[in-house]
Amino acid sequence: MSLVIRNLQRVIPIRRAPLRSKIEIVRRILGVQKFDLGIICVDNKNIQHINRIYRDRNVPTDVLSFPFHEHLKAGEFPQPDFPDDYNLGDIFLGVEYIFHQCKENEDYNDVLTVTATHGLCHLLGFTHGTEAEWQQMFQKEKAVLDELGRRTGTRLQPLTRGLFGGS
């Protein structure tokens, strides 16, 4: 099914073709390529607004995920009853926030891929509110990014590394 990437900001340049290519591979690795997915790139002002409305946090952030199929357990696949239900949901990337959070020698486009992968894991029910949930999500992200690396030659680390003292 389709992957739609929308760039609704003009602060940070987005290279959509490489991002699309890597996210398509991530979708295949996760086994969810038959589901629609929306990725929306926004600036700090808009990600902060969305974060305030939906999470009651009045600060910009890197990623917000809005699953079409709520209440999935970690790693569970949606079981659509109708063709229109083949939708994972939407991921909002705070690209301005992500750009400014990049460390020296980090490739911004790689960090976008990692952040989108993190958002995809959230759409599949993964969370990181507790150490056990974090460990499960970290392992999933790591496995996906390692496989992406085998297929593309990139070496990427999960977004959640270090959240609970992990490496």
From Swiss-Prot:
> Could you tell me the keywords of this UniProt record?
Endonuclease, Hydrolase, Metal-binding, Nuclease, Nucleus, Zinc
Which SUPFAM superfamilies does the entry link to? Metalloproteases ('zincins'), catalytic domain (SSF55486)
Q: Which PROSITE patterns match?
A: UPF0054
A family per Pfam: YbeY
Q: What class of enzyme is it?
A: hydrolase
Reported impact of D90R: No endonuclease activity
What EC number(s) are associated with this protein in UniProt?
3.1.-.-
Where would you find this protein in the cell?
Answer: Nucleus
User: An example Gene Ontology cellular component term from the record?
Assistant: mitochondrion
Add the further remark from the entry.
A protein of the expected size has been detected by antibody binding and Western blot in at least one of the analyzed tissues or cells.
What is the designated name of this protein?
Endoribonuclease YbeY
Organism, by scientific name, is: Homo sapiens
Originating gene: YBEY
